[in-house]
């Protein structure tokens, strides 16, 4: 699916960038990496959850603690609502806006997904257009979004019923 760069702190994961190449993932982090230590052992539990997810455990990513400090209340609400979408299922931007407490804020819901700091972990790939189209996906493009949805559906076939 691509390369992931993780940035964490005492209050949990601060960022996760999923991009097609390592260089793109690092560049996506930008200045957030300034002053960061390279400590792969700090993410042992996160990596374990990612491996379990890739092996078909649709709830594994729910265990990863996230640090939402500095995030607007609407984005926090939208990200939490997105996290509640079960693996193998999709919801519309309209649904997301309503769940975040602002039913008419579909564009803002789209912006919350576009600015998702936690690629894959907040599963914005599960949010699609009301007409069933994929919408957008900054975590590697629409091809990656489609593959993630197909993988989840294959691992959770009861979601298709």
Task: Kindly label every feature range from the protein language model.
Residues 130-161:
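…primarily DNA-binding HTH/wHTH and HhH modules…
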């Amino acid at each position: 699916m691509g390369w992931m760069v993780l940035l964490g702190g005492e209050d949990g994961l601060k960022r996760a960038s999923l991009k097609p190449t390592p260089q793109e993932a690092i560049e996506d982090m930008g200045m957030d990496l300034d002053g960061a230590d390279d400590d792969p052992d700090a993410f042992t539990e996160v990596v374990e959850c990612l491996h379990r997810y890739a092996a078909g455990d649709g709830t594994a990513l729910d265990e990863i603690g996230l640090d939402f400090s500095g995030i607007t209340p609407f984005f926090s609400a939208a990200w939490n609502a997105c996290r509640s979408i079960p693996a193998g299922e999709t919801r519309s931007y309209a649904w997301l806006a309503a769940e975040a407490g602002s039913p008419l804020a579909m564009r803002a819901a789209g912006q919350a997904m576009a600015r998702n700091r936690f690629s894959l972990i907040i599963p914005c790939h599960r949010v699609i257009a009301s007409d069933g189209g994929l919408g957008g996906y900054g975590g590697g493009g629409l091809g990656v979004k489609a593959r993630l949805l197909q993988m989840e559906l294959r691992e959770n076939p009861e979601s298709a019923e």
